[in-house]
Regions:
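A small/polar (G/S/T-enriched), proline-flanked helix-loop surface module common
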Residues: 9-185
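C-terminal motif of bacterial Sec signal peptides marking the signal peptidase cleavage site
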Residues: 2-5
Length: 185
């Protein structure tokens, strides 16, 4: 049993029975106000280009149109090959926000990539089934990874009519070592 409070002594002296409070940071950064959370993951600075190239099977070019650097709000980096675009985004958008966002269609509430559970979604308007998105909720924000197959044959590593989610799973293997730890679903 834990007791806390005050007791009165003979001379009306008061003593607390609780230990002094300490300013301990919560173990879940998602419980903190946005301005007190850790720095967002920066995919451009923290994912080696070599890992991206290994994941997509060849040389990549950065996609400047995808790049955003808004510390505390949105960090985005994108790369392109002749077959695919791969983008990684970090934000503090919550799982519930994604589940309630009409722009996304949930495919799996706890899809795992390399034993890390996350949220697998597609874009609601992706009628050609050429994109796939995997979302993790980490200690340094939501990490959103998207693969777009383009071209008439939707190729990935030379395979025609590739499944975008299987392609994303394969592309993520080498880059996931760079992702922050934590699973805060």
């Amino acid at each position: 049993m834990v007791l806390s409070g005050c007791v009165a002594g003979q001379a009306d002296d008061q003593a607390t029975t609780t230990s002094p409070t300490t300013a301990e940071a919560p173990s879940n950064p998602w419980d903190l106000p946005i301005e007190q959370r850790p720095a967002l993951f920066d995919p451009c600075a923290e994912i080696p280009v070599e890992a991206v190239e290994q994941g997509v099977g060849g040389p990549v070019e950065p996609v400047d149109e995808y790049t955003r650097h808004q510390p505390g709000g949105l960090m985005v980096c994108g790369w392109s090959t002749d077959e695919v675009d791969l983008s990684v985004l970090a934000t503090w958008k919550s799982r519930d926000d994604y589940l309630n966002d009409d722009m996304f269609k949930v495919q799996d509430l706890s899809y795992e990539v390399m034993d890390r559970p996350g949220l697998r979604v597609g874009e609601s308007d992706d009628y050609t089934k050429k994109t796939c998105i995997q979302i993790f909720f980490t200690a340094r924000g939501t990490i959103w990874t998207k693969l777009d197959l383009f071209g008439a044959f939707h190729e990935f590593k030379g395979e025609r009519f590739a499944d975008p989610c299987e392609s994303l799973d394969e592309a993520m293997v080498p880059i996931m070592a760079s992702f922050p730890e934590g699973d805060f679903r």
